Regions:
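Nucleotide and nucleotide-moiety/phosphate-recognizing core
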Residues: 2-164, 171-172
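Short, charged, intrinsically disordered terminal tails
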Residues: 174-177
Length: 177
């Protein structure tokens, strides 16, 4: 059942340079990474937004909002997602962290001050619209580190099961899933 008042943002962009092909289209069981993430967000959120680069022409079964920048960094997708969200609270997940669960995302949302993230870094994370001005400023100034952009905000650290946070950057990483 979806949580009323929670937006889910799926970051489907990324150059996939080390991987060699779009990570969003890698299969895990019967689903691609993108399909799985979209489903998990749908289990939790009453609104879902996928953000990427329109020029990438990614073939996924849902609309992808162009992040509106030439920047290839997660901060661009987070800003675009927060701007488009109709809710004040958003969970943001990258497509290349395919083992995330509804429960893990719910824990991030429940703990969110301005931001809630695991100790490993700013994604996945929960972001309130109160974080948007700091993120927009960092992006406008070319400061592309999401971790640095949230440093001055009220950030909750949420310990999650590390096995859920496996990031797939190379074909060998898929075998660890």
């Amino acid at each position: 059942m979806a949580h009323h008042g929670l937006t889910g943002v799926l970051l489907v962009g990324g150059a996939s340079t080390r991987f060699g092909s779009p990570k969003a289209l890698v299969r895990i069981g019967d689903e691609t990474f993108a399909e799985r993430a979209w489903r998990v967000l749908g289990e939790l959120c009453d609104e879902r937004i996928a953000v990427g680069k329109a020029a990438d022409g990614l073939e996924v079964p849902f609309a992808v909002l162009d992040d509106g920048t030439d920047v290839r960094a997660p901060i661009a997708g987070v800003v675009a997602g927060l701007r488009a969200a109709r809710n004040a609270l958003t969970v943001v997940i990258p497509v290349d962290v395919p083992l995330l669960t509804r429960e893990a995302l719910s824990a991030l949302a429940a703990a969110c001050l301005d931001v809630a993230v695991p100790p490993s870094g700013p994604l996945p994370g929960a972001y309130r619209t109160t974080a948007l001005p700091a993120l927009e400023l960092a992006l406008a100034e070319g400061r592309l580190s999401l971790r640095a952009a949230i440093a001055g905000l009220d950030v909750a650290t949420v310990v999650l099961d590390e096995s859920l946070l496996i990031n797939v950057n190379a074909p060998d990483d898929v075998r660890r899933l």
